[in-house]
């Protein structure tokens, strides 16, 4: 993978050295309350002689006809991508630009906003710094799910956060067989299975009792059984060089494989899903004033006074 932006590697990330002349902005087009912020960003970038590109969509095409680009141009020509919205919009954008090496940052207009680190009130000042090349980036690994049915690959898809195997409308538990590098690990009954990257460890997996993984750990991922009817089986972190295979043992239908909470794939009995590290990754722009652990404190409400010693 070739990064045209990288100049110097430091402990805080990768410094950017290329002059920024084109920025793509992805926004939830139905969130018209975000349009005033978008207008302010466009005005700033126009004043800095930076071209703004927007994706094709009815609302955006009507309001910004000269800035809308087709999907291919939007992806190919962007030097940096700004996302206005919640984590869902960010993940959708990240998957769109995965493997391109294009840095992405998010301005939070949603609720929790783990990935959208920038608040609307600080967006303009940061974008001004960004145009002056005053920012760093960090890579985030992605995982790949390959669905095998009757010995043939049905689909292959990458994910940034997590992939989840769940039952549909049935209340009965499902049975899943797990293997790591073709070695049998366990066969359990439960509500499903979560496979998460370090980035996704603070999403569904965290709610299901999984551990938090620091995203800078780019060499491992986790699997987390959902409500297993087996006290001994617990979440496990495994190296990214290992392949996890989950086989569907349940006899009833209406099972789903959900990718990043956005793509749902129906599963059948004896389907096999192989999970491994994807060759693609996502490049995130670092917040200049916040560390990962500060974001954790804020987003998860830990909020302990740092001067407390007891």
Locations of regions flagged by a protein language model:
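Gly/Ser-rich helix-loop-strand patches that form or flank binding pockets
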Residues: 97-107, 114
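ATP/NTP phosphate-donor binding region
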Residues: 3, 14, 18-80, 84, ...
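Short glycine-rich anion-binding loops that position phosphate/pyrophosphate groups of nucleotides
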Residues: 87-89, 110, 199-201
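Catalytic core of DAGKc-family lipid kinases
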Residues: 112-191
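ATP/nucleoside-binding phosphotransfer catalytic cores, i.e., glycine-rich phosphate-binding loops
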Residues: 157, 165, 170, 181-184, ...
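Short glycine/serine/threonine-rich phosphate/pyrophosphate-binding segments
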Residues: 34-35, 89-94, 202-207
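Gly/Ser/Thr-rich active-site loops/lids in small-molecule metabolic enzymes
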Residues: 187-232
